[in-house]
Amino acid sequence: MEQLKMRFKKLTVLTPRDKQTELDVKEEIYDAVIIVTFGPALERLLRXAFLLARPNSAVRVIVRDVDEAKVLREVKLAGFLRVMKVNNNAWKAYDCEKPNVSVGATVPLKLPHLNKKSNVWNIKVMDDDLIDEDTLLKDEDYVKPIKESHEEKLNFCGELKKRRPCKNCTCGLAEIVESEKVVAQLKPGKSSCGNCGLGDAFRCSACPYWGLPPFKPGEEGRIKLETVNDL
């Protein structure tokens, strides 16, 4: 102890009896700090020693009945460097050193200067990005479609060319063929004797108007309502 006092101008010893808190400690006023403890107060005394010691000052930790691994861990966690065991008796001693750092000191951070401007999204709409709708149309799109006839639309039975509807026709071809037959029957026939309009008494056996009432020339196939008797 005397050798340490001669070596260092300002030296202090911390024991578990020291009840001073971190707020009461005067920071960085000692050239050397000695800690003597049984172990339970080791963590608290190491924090106080870090505040009391000046940068690059020496700290000796003297402990008893404390596991060596725990001592080394606590000393490093407190911030001390270059931990070395100097005594392996009942009282074990460890020397360490406070780094060249002042308590509460600030260190400037050298950040790279970004001269390049950050890319900003360009929300301006460019005309080049717009698509001309006329370019999407092809030549065949301008051709007027041909309207299909009614008979072509009804060509579901596959028998339009033969003019024969199927047995159970549901597409309407059977009705078309039947209506064409009725129209053909109502078309004026050619008279061979010239007496068709006079009545059945003057008509020949092959007259197309057989059974119809007499009519004037040009009124073939027409029935006058006044000639029909109400039943």
UniProtKB/Swiss-Prot annotation:
Annotated region described as Fe-S binding site A, given as residue ranges: 157-171
Keyword Phosphoprotein attributed: no
Motif, Cx2C motif 1: chain positions: 193-196
Fe-S binding site B, as annotated region: 193-207
Protein keywords: 2Fe-2S, 4Fe-4S, Cytoplasm, Iron, Iron-sulfur, Metal-binding, Mitochondrion
Positions bound to [2Fe-2S] cluster: C157, C166, C169, C171
GO biological-process terms attached to the record: iron-sulfur cluster assembly
Region (Linker): 113-143
Keyword Metal-binding: yes
Any one of the GO CC terms: mitochondrial intermembrane space
Similarity section: Belongs to the anamorsin family.
Function: Component of the cytosolic iron-sulfur (Fe-S) protein assembly (CIA) machinery. Required for the maturation of extramitochondrial Fe-S proteins. Part of an electron transfer chain functioning in an early step of cytosolic Fe-S biogenesis, facilitating the de novo assembly of a [4Fe-4S] cluster on the cytosolic Fe-S scaffold complex. Electrons are transferred from NADPH via a FAD- and FMN-containing diflavin oxidoreductase.
Protein name: Anamorsin homolog
